[in-house]
Amino acid sequence: MQPGSSRCEEETPSLLWGLDPVFLAFAKLYIRDILDMKESRQVPGVFLYNGHPIKQVDVLGTVVGVRERDAFYSYGVDDSTGVINCICWKKLNTESVSAAPSAARELSLTSQLKKLQETIERRTKIEIGDTIRVRGSIRTYREEREIHATAYYKVDDPVWNIQIARMLELPTIYRKIYDQPFRSSALEKEEALSNPGALDLPSLTSLLSEKAKEFLMENRVQSFYQQELEMVESLLCLANQPVIHSACSDQVNFKKDTTSKAIHSIFKNAIQLLREKGLVFQKDDGFDNLYYVTREDKDLHRKIHQIIQQDCQKPNHMEKGCHFLHILACARLSIRPGLSEAVLQQVLELLEDQSDIVSTMEHYYTAF
């Protein structure tokens, strides 16, 4: 939890909010931050924490106040950082209890169900001092922030196991997710394209790599030499853009090189990024400097599919399928010793998209 981290100078366009996984999740936040978050100027009912759009939260705390109304309970929940009002709707009794049962057996069953329901309600009744978990949407009522619950329940936690687990979990979630500013890759790409001269060398290299990937996919290129990419006008214009130099790296000498040498270097680095993602690869250790596009190498797809299909017939792989590392080892033995994990992962995803193979569990694949 960082003071002032909920403020964001410029809101991300609401059309891009769906790219942030926090937007669709029940965010586990401290109550203090829920109370301090600023409401979006674009969409009422959506709040911003460090640029992350949040409309649903998950809180765990102690009940410090109870008010009952005809349709709902109002619980004051305290997690030691703040207190927030939670509106928890009563369950509607849809069964008609006034209808007279037609037989003694039905009378007995009805009375037993009624007693069971009363017992459950009595044991789950929430009172001051109880621990409660609430998941719901954030609302503002009479200028006070509150949570309208979609689900809530009393937590049986006599030795504080659940509360301690939450206390240990939240700092990690904040550090890895909430305190990392939300930046949409689509927005960054749009900004970069509109003003490529404002990029440093790594950012320009990354952008060139993305544009090269789009070019290869749109034109269904099967293989290429680096020099061929350097002749594509749109890519060449992008590579020729000036860059912001970093004084603490070797980038300061980038523009001192000859233009052709600098362009060759940035294209080489951009292709290397594609190789690291498994989108392109080289055969025979790259002696001929020819790159192959993973998506278009049908022969590689067929061989990987055959490995999975054949090994899944063996007794030790029939139930769960073949593990990723087993497929990788077989592929390196029968196809190419230098096959990378990234390339294999790309091939497996393509085969799965085509329904040639199925993922039975994490990292396990089978073919029919």
Curated annotation (Swiss-Prot):
Interaction with CTC1: region residues: 1-185
Domain of life: Eukaryota
Matches recorded under Pfam families: Stn1, STN1_2
UniProt main location, coarse: nucleus
Biological process per Gene Ontology, one example term: telomere maintenance via telomere lengthening
Keywords in alphabetical order: Chromosome, DNA-binding, Nucleus, Telomere
Segments for region (Winged helix-turn-helix (wHTH) 1): 191-295
Family the entry assigns: Belongs to the STN1 family.
Protein name: CST complex subunit STN1
Species for this entry: Macaca fascicularis (Crab-eating macaque)
